[in-house]
Amino acid sequence: MIPGEYQIQPGDIELNVGRRTVTLSVANSGDRPIQVGSHYHFFETNDALTFDRAASRGMRLNIPAGTAVRFEPGQSREIELVDLSGGRRVFGFAGRIMGDL
């Protein structure tokens, strides 16, 4: 083995197996691009993003860790969200929850 080398088993790696997901239509009504990271509480994203915010409470983007989705001005797209796991307590971000979900 070479230091730092990955030895990945063949086949697909499934993310977030068995967790609740929801698909939402999201539009950027602003005049600047908005980028949302993989573990950002989607409910608390920039107010220029228009979508069913209540349906996104306690959820994040269902994408690989360390990646992000970019919404260009005027762009609309379908995104998939997945339930946050762990203790289901949210602090920080935009400060809209600050505690248990």
UniProtKB/Swiss-Prot annotation:
Keywords: Cytoplasm, Hydrolase
The EC number(s) this enzyme carries: 3.5.1.5
GO cellular component labels: urease complex
InterPro entries linked: Urease_beta-like, Urease_betasu_sf, Urease_subunit
Pfam families: Urease_beta
GO molecular function, one term: urease activity
Annotated metabolic or biological route of this protein: Nitrogen metabolism; urea degradation; CO(2) and NH(3) from urea (urease route): step 1/1
Catalytic reactions of this protein: urea + 2 H2O + H(+) = hydrogencarbonate + 2 NH4(+)
Coiled coil: none
Keyword Cytoplasm listed: yes
UniProt superkingdom: Bacteria
Intracellular or extracellular location(s): Cytoplasm
An individual GO BP term: urea catabolic process
UniProt keyword Thylakoid, yes or no: no
NCBIfam families, per database record: PRK13203.1, urease_beta
Similarity section: Belongs to the urease beta subunit family.
Alphabetical list of PANTHER family matching this protein: UREASE (PTHR33569:SF1)
Subunit and partners: Heterotrimer of UreA (gamma), UreB (beta) and UreC (alpha) subunits. Three heterotrimers associate to form the active enzyme.
Annotated protein name in UniProt: Urease subunit beta
UniProt lineage: Bacteria, Pseudomonadati, Pseudomonadota, Gammaproteobacteria, Pseudomonadales
